[in-house]
Amino acid sequence: MLDWRLASAHFILAVTLTLWNSGKVLSVDVTTTEAFDSGVIDVQSTPTVREEKSATDLTAKLLLLDELVSLENDVIETKKKRSFSGFGSPLDRLSAGSVDHKGKQRKVVDHPKRRFGIPMDRIGRNRLSNSRG
């Protein structure tokens, strides 16, 4: 919705500037009111310094708005990705192996594997008897 508003504002300013430069915009100035009072209607009066300055300002504003529109269209995601996964976020295959566990390090103790019996069928069983893994 914001893009549509910005584009429409850009279009309106462009049309206004085009009409302003062509002299079709109706502006009331002190010189034109004096011309109406005297009965002489001069439609295309010479542009005053004030009109030239405002036209220059409008052109500068239009160019700035055009630059802002082009910058908004070229926006790149600037958020820095975290090197660790946040709480509650799912791990994917790539980030799961790259997580370093620098917090608590456990002592590695080798226990002899105790196996009382070999399971006959591993498929379909919920747990293997006396095995850890």
From Swiss-Prot:
One Gene Ontology term, aspect cellular component: extracellular space
Subcellular location: Secreted
UniProt cross-references to InterPro entries, sorted A to Z: Osteocrin
Pfam families: Musclin
N-terminal signal peptide: 1-27
Molecular function as annotated in GO: hormone activity
Keywords in alphabetical order: Amidation, Cleavage on pair of basic residues, Developmental protein, Differentiation, Hormone, Secreted, Signal
The keyword Signal is annotated on this UniProt entry: yes
Residues modified to Arginine amide: R132
UniProt induction comment: Expression is induced by neuronal activity in the developing cerebral cortex: expression is driven by the presence of a enhancer sequence only present in primates that binds the MEF2 transcription factors.
Gene Ontology process terms (BP): cell differentiation; cell surface receptor signaling pathway; endochondral bone growth; hormone-mediated signaling pathway; negative regulation of D-glucose import; negative regulation of dendrite extension; negative regulation of osteoblast differentiation
Keyword Membrane: no
Subunit structure of this chain's protein: Interacts with NPR3.
Similarity section: Belongs to the Osteocrin family.
Function: Hormone that acts as a regulator of dendritic growth in the developing cerebral cortex in response to sensory experience. Induced in the brain following membrane depolarization and inhibits dendritic branching in neurons of the developing cortex. Probably acts by binding to natriuretic peptide receptor NPR3/NPR-C, thereby preventing binding between NPR3/NPR-C and natriuretic peptides, leading to increase cGMP production.
Name this polypeptide is given: Osteocrin
Organism, scientific name: Macaca fascicularis
Gene that produces this protein: OSTN
